[in-house]
C-alpha cells in the first residue's frame, strides 16, 4: 500500500509545509471561496495524469472494466449511504427530525432513478469518483494543506441522493412490514370468524338432522369468500417476494458497506504513512495495489451472495422498534466527514509509520497534534464499529421479522389447508347423510311392500300386540317418570321445609333472645326501683320514729308547762295574768301546727306503705312471668339446638361430599394439565428435533462447502508441491550429472596423479642414485606444482557449473548418495516424507547439493497464510508440510484445531490491516469455537414467533425503545453508571478487557468481585473473575477465554448473548 501513498508526496511537497503550519483545516465553504494557488494547479495536473493512466489501464484490460465500474458504483453507494445516514442523524438530533416525518415514505422508483444516475456517472471522462476526498471530507486537524477540486460538489450531491434513497428504502421497508403485520392480523380475524360461522352451521346441521339440509350454508356461498381469500393470499405472497428481494439487495449493500475495500485502502494508507487522510479511489485503482484491490473486490462480490445471511447472524428482535432513530443508534457520535473505515484499535498509525509528513522534516508535527489525531482516529474507529454492529443488528432483526412473516404465511397456508379439509369433510358428511336418507326411504318402501304382502289378520294382530307393548312401555316409562318426579318434588319440598324450619327456628331464637334481653333489662330496672323504694321507706320510717319521739317530748314538755302554768297562775294570778294567757295562746297555736304536720306525715306513711305493697305484688307477678318465659325459652332452645345439630350434621355431610367432588375435580384437572404438558413437551421435542435437523443440515452444507474449499486448496498445494518436486528432480538430476562428471574428472586426475607419483618415484630413485641427501629434499618439494592440474580441472569444472561447490576432500561418503537415491525414490513413489529429507539435504554441510540455488520449501510447500508467519517466526518448515500432507489421516476436529493453531497471530509481527484480517479467527468461520457454539445452539427451537413471545429482551426493548441491542446496551450503561474506567458503547471492544463484565456482575455479586483491586491491563484475571462469578450462580460461560484474550474486538453477537444471559438470570 506504500506505492499507493507515493503519488501524493510531490503534491504535498509543493505546498512546502513546515512545523509552523500545523493547524486545523478550514471549513468547506472557505475552501470553495478561496482562489486556486499554484500548489492546487500542480495537484490538478498530477491528478489528470493519474486519470489518463487509469483510463489507459482500464482500456487495456476490457475484462476488468465492468468489475471496476461495479466496484466504483458499490463504493459510491456504500460511502454515500454511511455519510447520508450520519448527516440525517445529526440533522434530526438538532431539531429537524420533524421534517423527515413530514416528508413520508418515498416510492421505490426513487431509488432506482438514483442508482441509474450513479451508474451513468462513471462512464464520462469527468468522474466525480476521481476527485480527492480525503483533504476536503475530514474535519480532523491534519498536517496537509486544505485542497479542493471542482468536482467534489456533484460527488457530494450524488452521494447525498444515494444516501437519501437508502434511508428512505429502509423506512419504506419498516412501514411495509408494519402494514403486512396489520394485514396478517386482519386475515387471521377473518379466518377465525369464518371458522366460527362454519362450526355454528355444522352444529346446526347436526342438531336438525338430515331433514333440515336445505337450511345449511350451501358451498356456493363459500366459494367467493374462498376465492377472495386465495387472491389476497397470492397478492400477499407476491408482495412478500418483492420485500424479500428488496431486503436481500439492502443486505448486500450494507454488508458490502461494512467490508468495503475503500475503507481497507484508507486504513492501510493511514497505517503505512503517518498522514491520517484517506486515499482517493483513483489513486488506488491507478497503482498496482489498486488493481490488486479490484481483483479482491471481485472475489469478495462473488462470495458475498453465499455469506450474506451467515454474516448477519441470528438474533430475535423487535423490528418494528429497531428503527434508525437518533436516540436508538450511535450515528450521532460520528461526523458526516469521517473516513469510511478507520484503523483497527491495535494498530497505531504513528507507531509503525516509516514516512513522516511528505516534503517536511520528521519533527514537523508536534506531539499534541499526534495525540489528538490518534484519539480522534480511535474515536472514529469505535464509532464506525458501533455503527457496523448496529447495522448488523438491524439486519438480523429484519431477517427475524421476515422469518416471522414467513411463519405467519405458513400458518395462513395451514389454516387454508384445514379449511379445505373441513370443507371436504363437510361435503363427505353431507353425501353420507343423503345416502343414509336414500337407504331409509328404500327400507321404508320395502317395509310398506312387505306389510301389504302379508295377511291383514296377522298384520292386525301384530299391530295390536305392538301397540299394546308400546302403550305398556310408554305407561311404565310415564309411571317411572312420574314416580321419579314425585320423589324429586318430595325431596325438594322436604329440603325447602327443612330450610324454612331452620330459618324460622333461627328467627325464633333471635326473637326469644331479644325478648329475653328486654325482660332482663326490665327486671333489672324493677329491681333498681324496688331498691330505691325500700330506701325511701326506710328513710320515712326513720323520720316517723323521730317525729314520734319529738311528739312525746313535746307532750311531756307541754305537761310540764301546764303544771308550771297552774303554779304560776296560782302564784301570780293577780300580777301576770295577761302575759300568761298570751303565752298559752301561742303554745296552743304551736300545738295545733304540730298536730297538723303529724297528721300529714301519717298520711304520707300510709301512702308509702300502699305503694310498697303494690310494688311487691308487681314484683311477684314479674318473677312469675319471668320463670314461665324462662321455661319456654329453655324448651325452645333445646329444640333449636337439636335441629341445629341435625342441620350441622347434614351440612358436614354435604361439605364432605363437596370436598370429595372438588378433590375429584382437582385430580381430573391435574390429569388434564399433565396430558397438556406431555403434549406440549412432545411438540417442543418435535420442534427441537426439527430445528436440530435443519441446523445439522446447515452445518453439513457448511462443512461440505468448507471441505470443497479445503480440497481445492489441497489440489492447488499438491500441484504446487508437484511442481516443486519436478524442479527438485531436475536439480537432483543436474547435481547427479555434475557429480558423475566430477567423479570422472577425479578418477582421471587420480590416474594422472598415480602416474606422476610413479614417475616421481622413478626420478627420485634416479636422482638418489646420482645426487646426495640435499637433492632428495628438493625432489620431495616438487609434487605441489604437479598438483596444479587437478586444481585447474576443478576450477574448470566449477566454471562450467556455476553455483556448485565441489569438495576438495575425499569423495562424498555413501550416505549422501543413499539420501539422494532415497529422495529420488520418494519423488517417484509420491511419498510425503521427501519434504523433510529435502530440508535435511539443504542443512547438511557435506552434501554436494548445498551450493545449488534450488527454491526452498517454505516458498513452495507452505500455504500463503503460513508465509506471513515464516518471515518472523523460527517455526520449521517441515511442520507445516507434514501437517498439510497428513490431513487425510486425521479426524476433522484435529484438522480444524491444527488450522486454528497455525492461524494464530504472531506477537512479533507488526499488525497491519491485511495481516490482521488474515490472522483474525472469526474471518475463517471454520474453527473449533464456532463448531462448539453451533453444536450448543443446535437444539434451540427455530420458530421466531415462539422466541419473540418468550424473549424477555422484547420487554426491555419496549421499556427503553428501539431495538433489542440498543435497549440491552442502555441497560448495561445504566447498571454500570458510576464505575471508573467503564465506557460501554458497543458489544465488542467495550468488553474486551473484562472490566465491563466485572462491573456488571459487581452490581449483583459484590462479594465475588473485588472491583477496586482490578486493572484494565490484567485482562485474563478480569475475565476469569467475571466468568467464575457468573458460573457460581448458574450462568454457563458461552464465551471463549482465548478469543477474548487474543482479540481486541470479540464477536459482538456472542458477547451480547452472554450479557443477555446475565440480564435474564438477574432481572427476570
Curated annotation (Swiss-Prot):
Residue positions, PTM Phosphoserine: 38, 55, 112, 131, 134, 137-138, 218, 241, 361, 366, 369, 425, 847, 863, 912, 914
Region (Disordered): 1-221, 261-367, 777-796, 859-885, 898-922
One GO cellular component term noted in the UniProt record for this chain: apical part of cell
Polar residues composition-biased segments: 261-295, 309-323, 337-367, 866-875
Domain Calponin-homology (CH): 962-1067
Gene Ontology process terms (BP): actin cytoskeleton organization; associative learning; blastocyst development
Cellular localisation: Nucleus
Gene3D superfamilies per the UniProt record, alphabetical: Calponin-like domain
Noted disease: A chromosomal aberration involving CYTSB may be a cause of juvenile myelomonocytic leukemia. Translocation t(5;17)(q33;p11.2) with PDGFRB.
UniProt protein name: Cytospin-B
Origin species: Homo sapiens (Human)
Amino acid at each position: 500500500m506504500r506505492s499507493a501513498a507515493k503519488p501524493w508526496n510531490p503534491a504535498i511537497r509543493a505546498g512546502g509545509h513546515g512545523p509552523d503550519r500545523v493547524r486545523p483545516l478550514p471549513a468547506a465553504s472557505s475552501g470553495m471561496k478561496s482562489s486556486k494557488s499554484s500548489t492546487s494547479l500542480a495537484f490538478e495536473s498530477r491528478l489528470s495524469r493519474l486519470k489518463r493512466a487509469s483510463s489507459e489501464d482500464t482500456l487495456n484490460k476490457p475484462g476488468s472494466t465492468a468489475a471496476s465500474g461495479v466496484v466504483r458504483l458499490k463504493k459510491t453507494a456504500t460511502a454515500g449511504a454511511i455519510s447520508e445516514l450520519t448527516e440525517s442523524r445529526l440533522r434530526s438530533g438538532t431539531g429537524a427530525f420533524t421534517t423527515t416525518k413530514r416528508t413520508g415514505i418515498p416510492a421505490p422508483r426513487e431509488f432506482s432513478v438514483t442508482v441509474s444516475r450513479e451508474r451513468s456517472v462513471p462512464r464520462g471522462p469527468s468522474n466525480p469518483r476521481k476527485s480527492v476526498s480525503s483533504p476536503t471530507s475530514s474535519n480532523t486537524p491534519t498536517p496537509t494543506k486544505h485542497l479542493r477540486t471542482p468536482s467534489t460538489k456533484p460527488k457530494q450531491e450524488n452521494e447525498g441522493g444515494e444516501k437519501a434513497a437508502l434511508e428512505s428504502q429502509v423506512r419504506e421497508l419498516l412501514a411495509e412490514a408494519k402494514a403486512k403485520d396489520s394485514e396478517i392480523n386482519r386475515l387471521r380475524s377473518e379466518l377465525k370468524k369464518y371458522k366460527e360461522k362454519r362450526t355454528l352451521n355444522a352444529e346446526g346441521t347436526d342438531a336438525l338432522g338430515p331433514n333440515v339440509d336445505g337450511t345449511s350454508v350451501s358451498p356456493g356461498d363459500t366459494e367467493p369468500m374462498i376465492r377472495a381469500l386465495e387472491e389476497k393470499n397470492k397478492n400477499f405472497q407476491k408482495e412478500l417476494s418483492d420485500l424479500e428481494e428488496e431486503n436481500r439487495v439492502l443486505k448486500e449493500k450494507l454488508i458490502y458497506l461494512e467490508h468495503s475495500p475503500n475503507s481497507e485502502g484508507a486504513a492501510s494508507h493511514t497505517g503505512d504513512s503517518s498522514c491520517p487522510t484517506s486515499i482517493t479511489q483513483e489513486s488506488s485503482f491507478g497503482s498496482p495495489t489498486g488493481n490488486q484491490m479490484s481483483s479482491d473486490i471481485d472475489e469478495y462480490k462473488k462470495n458475498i451472495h453465499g455469506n450474506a445471511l451467515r454474516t448477519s447472524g441470528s438474533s430475535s428482535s423487535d423490528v418494528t422498534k429497531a428503527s434508525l432513530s437518533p436516540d436508538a443508534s450511535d450515528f450521532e457520535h460520528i461526523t458526516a466527514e469521517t473516513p469510511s473505515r478507520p484503523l483497527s484499535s491495535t494498530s497505531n498509525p504513528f507507531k509503525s509509520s516509516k514516512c513522516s509528513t511528505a516534503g517536511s522534516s520528521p519533527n514537523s508535527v508536534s506531539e499534541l497534534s499526534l495525540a489528538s489525531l490518534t484519539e480522534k482516529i480511535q474515536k472514529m474507529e469505535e464509532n464506525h464499529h458501533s455503527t457496523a454492529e448496529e447495522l448488523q443488528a438491524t439486519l438480523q432483526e429484519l431477517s427475524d421479522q421476515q422469518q416471522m412473516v414467513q411463519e405467519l404465511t405458513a400458518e395462513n397456508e395451514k389454516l387454508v389447508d384445514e379449511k379445505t379439509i373441513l370443507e371436504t369433510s363437510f361435503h363427505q358428511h353431507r353425501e353420507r347423510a343423503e345416502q343414509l336418507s336414500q337407504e331409509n326411504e328404500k327400507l321404508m318402501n320395502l317395509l310398506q311392500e312387505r306389510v301389504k304382502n302379508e295377511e291383514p289378520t296377522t298384520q292386525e294382530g301384530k299391530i295390536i300386540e305392538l301397540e299394546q307393548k308400546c302403550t305398556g312401555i310408554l305407561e311404565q316409562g310415564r309411571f317411572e317418570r312420574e314416580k321419579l318426579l314425585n320423589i324429586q318434588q318430595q325431596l325438594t319440598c322436604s329440603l325447602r321445609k327443612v330450610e324454612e324450619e331452620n330459618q324460622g327456628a333461627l328467627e325464633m331464637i333471635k326473637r326469644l333472645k331479644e325478648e329475653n334481653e328486654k325482660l332482663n333489662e326490665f327486671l333489672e330496672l324493677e329491681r333498681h326501683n324496688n331498691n330505691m323504694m325500700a330506701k325511701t321507706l326506710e328513710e320515712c320510717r326513720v323520720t316517723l320514729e323521730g317525729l314520734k319521739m319529738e311528739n312525746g317530748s313535746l307532750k311531756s314538755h307541754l305537761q310540764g308547762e301546764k303544771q308550771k302554768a297552774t303554779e304560776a297562775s296560782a302564784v301570780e294570778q293577780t300580777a301576770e295574768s295577761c302575759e300568761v294567757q298570751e303565752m298559752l295562746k301561742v303554745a296552743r297555736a304551736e300545738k295545733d301546727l304540730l298536730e297538723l304536720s303529724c297528721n300529714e306525715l301519717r298520711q304520707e306513711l300510709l301512702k308509702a306503705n300502699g305503694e310498697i305493697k303494690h310494688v311487691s305484688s308487681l314484683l311477684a307477678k314479674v318473677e312469675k312471668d319471668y320463670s314461665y318465659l324462662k321455661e319456654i325459652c329453655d324448651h325452645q332452645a333445646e329444640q333449636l339446638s337439636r335441629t341445629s345439630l341435625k342441620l350441622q350434621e347434614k351440612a358436614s355431610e354435604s361439605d364432605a361430599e363437596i370436598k370429595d367432588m372438588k378433590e375429584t375435580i382437582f385430580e381430573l384437572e391435574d390429569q388434564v394439565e399433565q396430558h397438556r404438558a406431555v403434549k406440549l413437551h412432545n411438540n417442543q421435542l418435535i420442534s427441537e428435533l426439527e430445528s436440530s435437523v435443519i441446523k445439522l443440515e446447515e452445518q453439513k452444507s457448511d462443512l461440505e462447502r468448507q471441505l470443497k474449499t479445503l480440497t481445492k486448496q489441497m489440489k492447488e498445494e499438491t500441484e504446487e508441491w508437484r511442481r516443486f518436486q519436478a524442479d527438485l528432480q531436475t536439480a537432483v538430476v543436474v547435481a547427479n550429472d555434475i557429480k558423475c562428471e566430477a567423479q570422472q574428472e577425479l578418477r582421471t586426475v587420480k590416474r594422472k596423479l598415480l602416474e606422476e607419483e610413479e614417475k616421481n618415484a622413478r626420478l627420485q630413485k634416479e636422482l638418489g642414485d646420482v645426487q646426495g641427501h640435499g637433492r632428495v629434499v628438493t625432489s620431495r618439494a616438487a609434487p605441489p606444482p604437479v598438483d596444479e592440474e587437478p586444481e585447474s580441472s576443478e576450477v574448470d569444472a566449477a566454471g562450467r557449473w556455476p553455483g556448485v561447490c565441489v569438495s576438495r576432500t575425499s569423495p562424498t561418503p555413501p550416505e549422501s548418495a543413499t539420501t539422494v537415491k532415497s529422495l529420488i525414490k520418494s519423488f517417484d513413489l509420491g511419498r510425503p516424507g521427501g519434504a523433510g529429507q529435502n530440508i535435511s539435504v539443504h542443512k547438511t554441510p557435506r552434501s554436494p547439493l548445498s551450493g545449488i540455488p534450488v527454491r526452498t520449501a517454505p516458498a513452495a510447500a507452505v500455504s500463503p497464510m503460513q508465509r506471513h508467519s515464516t518471515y518472523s517466526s523460527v517455526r520449521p518448515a517441515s511442520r507445516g508440510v507434514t501437517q498439510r500432507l497428513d490431513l487425510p489421516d486425521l479426524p476433522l476436529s484435529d484438522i480444524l484445531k491444527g488450522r486454528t493453531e497455525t492461524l494464530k497471530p504472531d506477537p512479533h509481527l507488526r499488525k497491519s490491516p491485511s495481516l490482521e484480517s488474515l490472522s483474525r479467527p472469526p474471518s475463517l468461520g471454520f474453527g473449533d469455537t464456532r463448531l462448539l457454539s453451533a453444536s450448543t445452539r443446535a437444539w434451540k427451537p427455530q420458530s421466531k414467533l415462539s422466541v419473540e413471545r418468550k424473549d424477555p429482551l422484547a420487554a426491555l426493548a419496549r421499556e427503553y425503545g428501539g431495538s433489542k441491542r440498543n435497549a440491552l446496551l442502555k441497560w448495561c450503561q445504566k447498571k454500570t453508571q458510576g464505575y471508573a474506567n467503564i465506557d460501554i458503547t458497543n458489544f465488542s471492544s467495550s468488553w474486551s478487557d473484562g472490566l465491563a463484565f466485572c462491573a456488571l456482575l459487581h452490581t449483583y455479586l459484590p462479594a465475588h468481585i473485588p472491583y477496586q483491586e482490578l486493572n484494565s491491563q490484567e485482562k485474563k484475571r478480569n475475565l476469569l473473575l467475571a466468568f467464575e462469578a457468573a458460573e457460581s450462580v448458574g450462568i454457563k460461560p458461552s464465551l471463549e477465554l482465548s478469543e477474548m484474550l487474543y482479540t481486541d474486538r470479540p464477536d459482538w453477537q456472542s458477547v451480547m448473548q452472554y450479557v443477555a444471559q446475565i440480564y435474564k438470570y438477574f432481572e427476570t
